[in-house]
Amino acid sequence: MASGREIKSKIKSVQNTRKVTRALEMVSASKIRKAQEQMKISRPYAQAMKQMTGHLAQANTDYLHPFLIAHKQVKRIGYIVISSDRGLAGGLNNNLFRKMLGEMRQWQDKGAEVDIVTIGQKASVFFRRIKVNILGSVTHLGDTPRLEQLIGVIKVMLDAYTEEKLDRVYLVYNRFINTMVQKASFDQLLPLLAAKDKVAHHDWDYLYEPDAATVLEHVMRRYIESLVYQAMLENIASEHAARMVAMKAASDNANKLIGTLQLVYNKARQAAITQEISEIVGGAAAV
């Protein structure tokens, strides 16, 4: 059995770790509220862009934007993968990567190749380690990312699709359901799926200035950028929620371990006292 001093040292070490996990839990609880507010603020813009894009896609124009054209054969797939920059978030990133690998294997079994761009340090490190072809990467965006920080990697994928180097593009991220539930999501970005709304049958059209191609090019790109940005905010909220839950579990486990070590310490101390009494009694009897 370990000595009382060693056990005391272990208890102190676990108590120090518990202080860290409790602090991280409280910080994440605070940040998750801010992340949810950011999600709410950005949604009206994303919804307005979706509605406008749906109207333009169904309008009477002779011009069909490349993002609306489905390629006949699917030989190369592109993924925009969003992860966190930091760890200590439970299995959030690993669960996403595991499902991502499953999706990649399905396409590879069909003879398709895979290219990706990564947003977040964890995704960049993971996919470089397993030798996936990475077209672009952006990291260390913080808790309040700006859209202009994402435009570069998004443009890489959009240009590749326009040039027919990619046949489909998917967006991969953790969707925030609630504090306890985050879901790995795979959304098809390209080709854009036609919106099913009340304007499906109409006899109207827009007046385009300077022309339909220029307007559609601008709107389609802004729309896809808004989707990626919204997914980024969802992933940030998911990260803080997962970290808060993970740190709460770590603090609870620390409490249990401290209780167990305290019991062991008490038993060791009791055994030492009993031995000392026995030695004193034995010495007195010998005299």
From Swiss-Prot:
Recorded GO CC terms: plasma membrane; proton-transporting ATP synthase complex
Membrane topology: Peripheral membrane protein
CDD domains in the record: F1-ATPase_gamma (cd12151)
Similarity comment text for this entry: Belongs to the ATPase gamma chain family.
Subunit structure: F-type ATPases have 2 components, CF(1) - the catalytic core - and CF(0) - the membrane proton channel. CF(1) has five subunits: alpha(3), beta(3), gamma(1), delta(1), epsilon(1). CF(0) has three main subunits: a, b and c.
Record GO terms (molecular function): ATP binding; proton-transporting ATP synthase activity, rotational mechanism
Membrane as UniProt keyword: yes
Annotated InterPro entries: ATP_synth_F1_ATPase_gsu, ATP_synth_F1_gsu, ATP_synth_F1_gsu_CS
One Pfam entry name: ATP-synt
PROSITE patterns: ATPASE_GAMMA (PS00153)
Source taxonomy: Bacteria, Pseudomonadati, Pseudomonadota, Gammaproteobacteria, Lysobacterales
Swiss-Prot/TrEMBL keywords: ATP synthesis, Cell inner membrane, Cell membrane, CF(1), Hydrogen ion transport, Ion transport, Membrane, Transport
Protein name, per record: ATP synthase gamma chain
Compartments reported by the entry: Cell inner membrane
Protein's GO biological process: proton motive force-driven plasma membrane ATP synthesis
Function description: Produces ATP from ADP in the presence of a proton gradient across the membrane. The gamma chain is believed to be important in regulating ATPase activity and the flow of protons through the CF(0) complex.
